[in-house]
Amino acid sequence: MPTINQLIRKPRKSQTEKTASPALQNCPQRRGICTRVMTVTPKKPNSALRKVARVRLSNGFEVTAYIPGIGHNLQEHSVVLIRGGRVKDLPGVRYHIVRGAKDTLGVNNRKKGRSKYGTKKPKA
């Protein structure tokens, strides 16, 4: 325990909170350009080929972002919108690409949870 005098000389430092998505810089989303589109394999108990893209953001950051949904139309130089949100079984992937925004098309033939995948309401 420090004395009162010690606390006056050198006050306590407040702990700084680390952000989960630093590249967004407190913005809800960021625009970026795909520099590489690839598949990666997940961590130990899981097995798949997860679709990810390396994205150069408008603020200069370069991040790896997950492409959600079945099938996508992304390639190099595609303009995408990035939101926060990590993928638990892919180390280093801390961002998601927003489907249905910019050059990214929505998921085809999606009936449920359409808003998360940028799919329009099907004609009845």
Curated annotation (Swiss-Prot):
UniProt GO BP: translation
Keyword match Nucleus: no
Lineage: superkingdom: Bacteria
GO function term, MF aspect, one: tRNA binding
Alphabetical keyword list: Methylation, Ribonucleoprotein, Ribosomal protein, RNA-binding, rRNA-binding, tRNA-binding
Residues making up the signal peptide according to the UniProt record: none
InterPro entries: NA-bd_OB-fold, Ribosomal_uS12, Ribosomal_uS12_bac
Region of interest (Disordered), residue spans: 1-27
Cellular component aspect of the GO annotation: small ribosomal subunit
Compositional bias (Polar residues): 17-27
Residues with 3-methylthioaspartic acid modification: 89
NCBIfam families linked: rpsL_bact
Subunit organization: Part of the 30S ribosomal subunit. Contacts proteins S8 and S17. May interact with IF1 in the 30S initiation complex.
Family: Belongs to the universal ribosomal protein uS12 family.
Known function: With S4 and S5 plays an important role in translational accuracy.
HAMAP family reported in the protein's UniProt record: Ribosomal_uS12_B
Name the record gives this protein: Small ribosomal subunit protein uS12
The organism of origin for this protein: Borreliella burgdorferi (strain ATCC 35210 / DSM 4680 / CIP 102532 / B31)
